[in-house]
A protein has these predicted regions:
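Short acidic/glycine-rich loops and adjacent helix/strand connectors
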Residues: 1-157
Length: 157
């Protein structure tokens, strides 16, 4: 999804220290996922709503069905993630969302909801590249990983 479609112009990400709380949104394909993370590594909540059953009879993900399901699920999943983390909007320092690559309709649901919260809460919106996020997720498990490194990154079906 490019900057023209999402309004997610490249910006400097907010400085993350051990107390920074980010609400992260992921809707690039067929799962609606929201997590609250403190300090870049401490996962306070992670809520995932799968659409596997919706797409099973088609033998793969149907983009329009995925987008409509995200539209129905995004607010309840966000609310549950905040509730499970014991947070509300005034506790959140930034809102991040996957901006691509992915299914355009699915991405727009997540980006729109995330940007709306960032605007309402007057906090930065951080655009996240889906593939880069897969790479950096390894640091959650092993924060001492060092560059340079060789990575095989496979995503999707």
């Amino acid at each position: 999804v490019n900057e023209h479609l999402t309004g997610a112009a490249p910006v400097d990400a907010p400085v993350v220290d051990e107390s920074t709380i980010v609400l992260g949104v992921e809707t690039s394909c067929d799962e609606t996922a929201v997590a609250c993370v403190r300090g870049g590594r401490d996962v306070l909540s992670s809520v995932v709503s799968s659409q596997v059953d919706l797409h099973a009879r088609y033998g793969g993900v149907v983009p329009e069905i995925a987008s409509r399901a995200h539209n129905e699920l995004i607010i309840p999943v966000m609310a549950r993630a905040l509730l499970e983390a014991g947070l509300d909007g005034e506790d959140v320092d930034a809102v991040a969302a996957t901006t691509g690559p992915g299914l355009i309709g699915a991405l727009l649901v997540g980006v729109s909801a995330a940007k709306a919260l960032a605007l309402a809460w007057d906090v930065p919106f951080v655009a996240v590249n889906h593939l880069e996020a897969h790479l950096y997720a390894g640091f959650l498990e092993d924060p001492d990983l060092q560059f340079p490194m060789v990575v095989l990154l496979v995503s999707g079906g």
